[in-house]
Amino acid sequence: MMVKVASITKLEDGSIVTPKGFSAIGTAIGLKKGKKDLGAIVCDTPASCAAVYTTNQIQAAPLQVTKDSIATEGKLQAIIVNSGNANACTGMKGLQDAYEMRALGAEHFGVKENYVAVASTGVIGVPLPMEIIRKGIVTLIPAKEENEAHSFSEAILTTDLITKETCYEMIIDGKKVTIAGVAKGSGMIHPNMATMLSFITTDAHIEHDVLQTALSQITNHTFNQITVDGDTSTNDMVIAMASGLSETKPIDMEHADWETFVFALQKVCEDLAKKIAQDGEGATKLIEVNVLGAQTNEEAKKIAKQIVGSSLVKTAIHGEDPNWGRIISSIGQSEVAINPNTIDITLQSIVVLKNSEPQMFSEEEMKMRLQEHEIMIDVYLHLGEETGSAWGCDLSYEYVKINACYRT
């Protein structure tokens, strides 16, 4: 998609409250010791919304409630999120608790119940401590200040080491339109959606069905192309809210600036996806895999994700070992039809394989480049014109330690 980069500007100090109409808050209520664990995003008016959910067949209670809310009118005005407890596999009581969270939020913020989404993340199979939740929700006072947006980003974290935020400005109908996002995710990342939550705000004027189409397509190229450990979760989703307060004409696929909006949405999702991959549990390196010259985009993405999801590739990268044999082995495991004689592989811009034949390279130079925190693997199939990318991280000793002691 060709879009003038000049029409998109990254706002380094922007946040989810930068788009017109949004406020946020994050606070500590006692679900996690000494850390923020409850947050909310609120819109001044009912906002068009869209969502993409985990494909795990076991879906947590908050996800079911959010689906119910969005299906009613395709609008949201508030999102309430807790961390420290997933409210997953908690039976009928868990579903009742999630609906109560929605009702409490609606009453507190003065909005319709079906305008409230709820999300939870944390330990599975533990009942939600509703007495703490009830007392906590009534203390939420969202604000339009950037520091409150940052407090929300902290409140949704679990094993994450860093908050994940991004914001862009674009020109639609000659007017400034902003779009921002926040996410959490560190372990159990292998979406079609998995163990990650992301919330996107924009003041673009766009209807529910159009926004849903754009979000679904972009999620497939961004969030669904990250993997940390190959496990999918029960709770996770991406929700986008559009206040419409930029006062442009309605944006749809026929709008002259449609591609600009889609590009900005993709940049937000891609930024957050990379931040999640980079913050994988125990991770020390971000791995980006680009597959070029494939017959279809889907095949390119499948190969890229196969490579970045390989435990052997991950451990080689962690050990700063240029073992490209693990990369080509992963390509062969992808179940995509390839020509085994025409494959090129570059690692950190150094050619290690050409037409499927090993190439001489400086081990010393390679070792130095593999010490960097961002690792790039490029694969050229020479079969077609399509490309695809995926993101992940290395696999370290610390990952095992974190997950062996998660409940303790």
Curated annotation (Swiss-Prot):
The active site is at T195 (nucleophile). Pathway: Amino-acid biosynthesis; L-arginine biosynthesis; L-ornithine and N-acetyl-L-glutamate from L-glutamate and N(2)-acetyl-L-ornithine (cyclic): step 1/1; Amino-acid biosynthesis; L-arginine biosynthesis; N(2)-acetyl-L-ornithine from L-glutamate: step 1/4. CDD domains: OAT (cd02152). The keyword Protein transport does not apply. It is found in: Cytoplasm. It catalyses: N(2)-acetyl-L-ornithine + L-glutamate = N-acetyl-L-glutamate + L-ornithine; L-glutamate + acetyl-CoA = N-acetyl-L-glutamate + CoA + H(+). Keywords: Acyltransferase, Amino-acid biosynthesis, Arginine biosynthesis, Autocatalytic cleavage, Cytoplasm, Multifunctional enzyme, Transferase. It is an enzyme of class 2 (transferase). Substrate binds at T158, K184, T195, E281, N403, T408. Its EC number is 2.3.1.35, 2.3.1.1. GO terms for cellular component: cytoplasm. The record marks T121, G122 as: Involved in the stabilization of negative charge on the oxyanion by the formation of the oxyanion hole. GO terms for biological process: L-arginine biosynthetic process; ornithine biosynthetic process. GO terms for molecular function: glutamate N-acetyltransferase activity; L-glutamate N-acetyltransferase activity. It comes from the Bacteria. The record marks A194, T195 as: Cleavage. Catalyzes two activities which are involved in the cyclic version of arginine biosynthesis: the synthesis of N-acetylglutamate from glutamate and acetyl-CoA as the acetyl donor, and of ornithine by transacetylation between N(2)-acetylornithine and glutamate. Heterotetramer of two alpha and two beta chains. Belongs to the ArgJ family. This is Arginine biosynthesis bifunctional protein ArgJ.
